[in-house]
């Protein structure tokens, strides 16, 4: 590319000659005393391809040298830093900022249209005071809650660290502690954050950092209005002892007519009832997760109807003050239903198995005195004497479970061992 002022390839009247760059606090560094080099028409802008003044500096000790990447005209059009291309107000990528402000800036990308657009914007910048952005961004006056939650308010100086030493990754670095690069394990090459393009970041398309922040914003808690359209009450918790009913009225009156304000000092909460559902929805949207009264952050939720609160308490086992009750240990389970009237006579309350008549056990008694005992089996005639049922006092109560129940146990009959 020809860089002489006499060449007609580019409009040399629009070459940039600046005295100081447009930088964010992170890129500038934490050291207030820095030495910065200035190279007039050193490189061409990576967006508009026009030569501009390049600044180079070191943001701190053990940090890498940084330089400006885009011209000041492109920086002012998007209100971004000339080095990192992040928004100067929120510290966020352009794609996240545009999504939060709900607008899309369609800048031309062809060479001729881009040059014409840049010249018109430079004319608009020269007619302004230079304190506010121009173009579509200057017309966006409303702020977004998502941007306030995702905004990076403090500098992150670790972003200025040196790059990873490629020789150390291969195990060939011989500098040791004198190596100006980092000796750390590199990130996964398949990680989307490892592949970033400066043009994609400037135009707000296919930015992996912006996609990560937008996914985080989508998972943030939200306060959805209840399905019951009759609910117009908001719950405000965490009042403390310093916030009064007047303070709450002074904040919520801007959203609509307030019907009642009930402050419960014991629970340090309040219930604000609006006259219309629309006013309650606007108040909930504007106050959720960002209500601060007298230096105290308050919690805002939708109120619930009495029927819904009663059902939830019965289901969860909670008291009126919100204390969850623990189950009492050792209590029996649910009792079975009582038996019918005709089954009461035969009801088995102890779940015992049905028992039949008591078993009869034939016990061989010793012969009376003076009578010889019968011969052992096999030595005498086989005689069968039918025996009648034993008397009631000789019947066994049932099967034997313990040794002491055995009638043949030694010592069970005193007459067996007595002499005749």
Curated annotation (Swiss-Prot):
<feature type="cross-link" description="Glycyl lysine isopeptide (Lys-Gly) (interchain with G-Cter in SUMO2)">
    <location>
        <position position="149"/>
    </location>
</feature>
<dbReference type="GO" id="GO:0071466">
    <property type="term" value="P:cellular response to xenobiotic stimulus"/>
</dbReference>
<feature type="modified residue" description="Phosphoserine">
    <location>
        <position position="102"/>
    </location>
</feature>
<keyword id="KW-0832">Ubl conjugation</keyword>
<keyword id="KW-0507">mRNA processing</keyword>
<feature type="cross-link" description="Glycyl lysine isopeptide (Lys-Gly) (interchain with G-Cter in SUMO2)">
    <location>
        <position position="290"/>
    </location>
</feature>
<feature type="modified residue" description="Phosphoserine">
    <location>
        <position position="4"/>
    </location>
</feature>
<dbReference type="InterPro" id="IPR012677">
    <property type="entry name" value="Nucleotide-bd_a/b_plait_sf"/>
</dbReference>
<dbReference type="GO" id="GO:0045292">
    <property type="term" value="P:mRNA cis splicing, via spliceosome"/>
</dbReference>
<dbReference type="GO" id="GO:0000974">
    <property type="term" value="C:Prp19 complex"/>
</dbReference>
<dbReference type="InterPro" id="IPR036855">
    <property type="entry name" value="Znf_CCCH_sf"/>
</dbReference>
<feature type="domain" description="RRM">
    <location>
        <begin position="232"/>
        <end position="305"/>
    </location>
</feature>
<protein>
    <recommendedName>
        <fullName>Pre-mRNA-splicing factor RBM22</fullName>
    </recommendedName>
</protein>
<feature type="modified residue" description="N6-acetyllysine">
    <location>
        <position position="212"/>
    </location>
</feature>
<keyword id="KW-0963">Cytoplasm</keyword>
<dbReference type="InterPro" id="IPR035979">
    <property type="entry name" value="RBD_domain_sf"/>
</dbReference>
<keyword id="KW-0479">Metal-binding</keyword>
<dbReference type="Pfam" id="PF00076">
    <property type="entry name" value="RRM_1"/>
</dbReference>
<dbReference type="GO" id="GO:0042307">
    <property type="term" value="P:positive regulation of protein import into nucleus"/>
</dbReference>
<feature type="zinc finger region" description="C3H1-type">
    <location>
        <begin position="159"/>
        <end position="186"/>
    </location>
</feature>
<keyword id="KW-0813">Transport</keyword>
<keyword id="KW-1017">Isopeptide bond</keyword>
<keyword id="KW-0007">Acetylation</keyword>
<dbReference type="GO" id="GO:0071013">
    <property type="term" value="C:catalytic step 2 spliceosome"/>
</dbReference>
<dbReference type="GO" id="GO:0048306">
    <property type="term" value="F:calcium-dependent protein binding"/>
</dbReference>
<keyword id="KW-0747">Spliceosome</keyword>
<comment type="subunit">
    <text>Component of the pre-catalytic and catalytic spliceosome complexes. Component of the postcatalytic spliceosome P complex. Interacts with PDCD6; the interaction induces translocation of PDCD6 in the cytoplasm. Interacts with PPIL1.</text>
</comment>
<dbReference type="Pfam" id="PF21369">
    <property type="entry name" value="STL11_N"/>
</dbReference>
<dbReference type="GO" id="GO:0005634">
    <property type="term" value="C:nucleus"/>
</dbReference>
<dbReference type="GO" id="GO:0046827">
    <property type="term" value="P:positive regulation of protein export from nucleus"/>
</dbReference>
<dbReference type="GO" id="GO:0005654">
    <property type="term" value="C:nucleoplasm"/>
</dbReference>
<feature type="region of interest" description="Disordered">
    <location>
        <begin position="371"/>
        <end position="420"/>
    </location>
</feature>
<dbReference type="GO" id="GO:0005737">
    <property type="term" value="C:cytoplasm"/>
</dbReference>
<dbReference type="GO" id="GO:0017070">
    <property type="term" value="F:U6 snRNA binding"/>
</dbReference>
<feature type="modified residue" description="N-acetylalanine">
    <location>
        <position position="2"/>
    </location>
</feature>
<keyword id="KW-0862">Zinc</keyword>
<feature type="compositionally biased region" description="Basic and acidic residues">
    <location>
        <begin position="309"/>
        <end position="318"/>
    </location>
</feature>
<dbReference type="GO" id="GO:0071007">
    <property type="term" value="C:U2-type catalytic step 2 spliceosome"/>
</dbReference>
<dbReference type="InterPro" id="IPR039171">
    <property type="entry name" value="Cwc2/Slt11"/>
</dbReference>
<keyword id="KW-0539">Nucleus</keyword>
<dbReference type="GO" id="GO:0008270">
    <property type="term" value="F:zinc ion binding"/>
</dbReference>
<keyword id="KW-0694">RNA-binding</keyword>
């Amino acid at each position: 590319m020809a860089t002489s002022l006499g060449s007609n390839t580019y409009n040399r009247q629009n070459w940039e000659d600046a005295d100081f760059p447009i930088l964010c606090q992170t890129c500038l560094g934490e050291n207030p005393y820095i030495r910065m080099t200035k190279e007039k028409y050193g490189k061409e802008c990576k967006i508009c391809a026009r030569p501009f003044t390049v600044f180079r500096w070191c943001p701190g000790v053990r940090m890498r040298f940084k330089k400006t990447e885009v011209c000041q005209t492109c920086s002012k059009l998007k209100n971004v830093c000339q080095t990192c291309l992040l928004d100067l107000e929120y510290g966020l990528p352009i794609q996240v900022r545009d999504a939060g402000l709900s607008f899309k800036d369609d800048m031309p990308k062809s060479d001729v249209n881009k040059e014409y657009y840049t010249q018109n914007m430079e004319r608009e910048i020269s007619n302004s005071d230079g304190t506010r952005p121009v173009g579509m961004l200057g017309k966006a006056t409303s702020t977004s809650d998502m941007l306030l939650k995702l905004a990076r308010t403090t500098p992150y100086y670790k972003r200025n660290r040196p790059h990873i030493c490629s020789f150390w990754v291969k195990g060939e670095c011989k500098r040791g502690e004198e190596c100006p690069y980092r000796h750390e394990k590199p990130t996964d090459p398949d990680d989307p954050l490892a592949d970033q393009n400066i043009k994609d970041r400037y135009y707000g398309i296919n930015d992996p950092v912006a996609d990560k922040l937008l996914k985080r914003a989508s998972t943030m808690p939200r306060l959805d209005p209840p399905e019951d359209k009759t609910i117009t009450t908001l719950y405000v918790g965490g009042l403390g002892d310093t916030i009064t009913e007047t303070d709450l009225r002074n904040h919520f009156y801007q959203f609509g007519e307030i019907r009642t304000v009930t402050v419960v000092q014991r629970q340090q909460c309040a219930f604000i009832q609006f006259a219309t559902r629309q006013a309650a929805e606007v108040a909930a949207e504007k106050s959720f997760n960002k209500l601060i009264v007298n230096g105290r952050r308050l919690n805002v939720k939708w109120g619930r109807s009495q029927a819904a609160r009663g059902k939830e308490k019965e289901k969860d086992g909670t008291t009126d003050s919100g204390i969850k009750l623990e189950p009492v240990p050792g209590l029996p389970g649910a009792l079975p239903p009582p038996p019918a009237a005709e089954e009461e006579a035969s009801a088995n309350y102890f779940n015992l198995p049905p028992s039949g008549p008591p078993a009869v056990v034939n016990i061989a008694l010793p012969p009376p005195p003076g009578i010889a005992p019968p011969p052992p089996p096999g030595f005498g005639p086989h005689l069968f004497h039918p025996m009648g049922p034993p008397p009631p006092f000789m019947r066994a109560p049932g099967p034997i479970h313990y040794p002491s129940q055995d009638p043949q146990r030694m010592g069970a009959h005193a007459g067996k061992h007595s002499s005749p």
